[in-house]
């Protein structure tokens, strides 16, 4: 990906974009820094250039600020775009800036985007919300931030370029921040409580909720976070009717299975074909799985096929070709190798690991 849009004359745009945001240094978005200060002029003539900028990959300046982890420039953009549709613009992979922040595990960026009005239930091209992605890469702190009610916005704020539209005369006598009308705030307060809860039941295009994803990835801490947030512990995935308990058994994740059982998940849940979690556990080599289920009152299987069916082998996954959606982030990001997603960026990142 290229760098960020320039903040000046259009003729200079290519040079700015080719240089990459990372080369601008930590003061790039500070008053008087490269691209700001004198170039802003008396009005907002620079705004169409910045907020209209899109790379060949569909990334906006906001996407690039997140990818390059350039917080000063991110803060600058959010000062003008918070509460507007710009927050949820999607690139060619369907990713918003919030999706990218979750993939990168950048908690502070997730918090800022969330507080600025980024949509929680926007789906990227595989149907993943930001919470799905946080579950896929094990970004616990990001998930924790997303599982909180949205922070309230300030009640007093003047108009800005994005809030008022390009046809209105900008008010240049105020600090540039987004417009939050009282009517919008009242509506926001009514919906904020439900807003963050809706993502718990959001399904990706494989029919997996964030809890399904966390269970498949054997992530005990993530499952605990989702449980505490109120996720449905018995919701089946749509392909075969597997509950989170079935998925935990198929992943042979005894610690996840125990956590779900202690939290009240139904040990008698049945797949569409009638198989119970215990029936599935008896087909696995790990004896702890069946022991845990019996200890929590799981009924003994009756009349269940002793052979693994197509569903019980975890064949349902979203491990289809996801392209190189992580490549540019990894190349341009300053993240350490230990914080990258658990599989190479050029390979698909499956929700449903194949059984050993």
From Swiss-Prot:
Report each ANK repeat as a residue range: 57-86, 93-122, 126-155, 206-235, 240-269, 273-302
Q: What is its main location?
A: cytoplasm
**Acidic residues bias spans:** 183-193, 318-328
> Which locations, inside or outside the cell, does it occupy?
Cytoplasm; Nucleus
Q: Is the keyword Phosphoprotein assigned to this protein?
A: yes
GO (cellular component) term, any one: nucleus
Region Disordered, residue ranges? 149-193, 298-356
Q: Which GO terms describe its molecular function?
A: transcription coactivator activity
Q: Which InterPro entries match?
A: Ankyrin_rpt (IPR002110), Ankyrin_rpt-contain_sf (IPR036770)
Q: Which UniProt keywords apply?
A: ANK repeat, Cytoplasm, Nucleus, Phosphoprotein, Repeat
SMART domains in the record: ANK
Q: After translation, how is this protein modified?
A: Phosphorylated by RPS6KA1; followed by degradation. Interaction with NKIRAS1 and NKIRAS2 probably prevents phosphorylation.
Tissue expression, per UniProt? Answer: Expressed in all tissues examined.
Q: One Pfam annotation, family name?
A: Ank_2
Q: Where Phosphoserine occurs, residue numbers?
A: 19, 23, 183, 313, 315
Instruction: List this protein's GO terms for biological process.
Output: cellular response to lipopolysaccharide; DNA-templated transcription; inflammatory response; regulation of canonical NF-kappaB signal transduction; signal transduction
**What is this protein's function per UniProt?**
Inhibits NF-kappa-B by complexing with and trapping it in the cytoplasm. However, the unphosphorylated form resynthesized after cell stimulation is able to bind NF-kappa-B allowing its transport to the nucleus and protecting it to further NFKBIA-dependent inactivation. Association with inhibitor kappa B-interacting NKIRAS1 and NKIRAS2 prevent its phosphorylation rendering it more resistant to degradation, explaining its slower degradation.
Tell me its family: Belongs to the NF-kappa-B inhibitor family.
Q: How does it assemble?
A: Interacts with THRB (via ligand-binding domain). Interacts with RELA and REL. Interacts with COMMD1. Interacts with inhibitor kappa B-interacting Ras-like NKIRAS1 and NKIRAS2.
Q: What is this protein called?
A: NF-kappa-B inhibitor beta
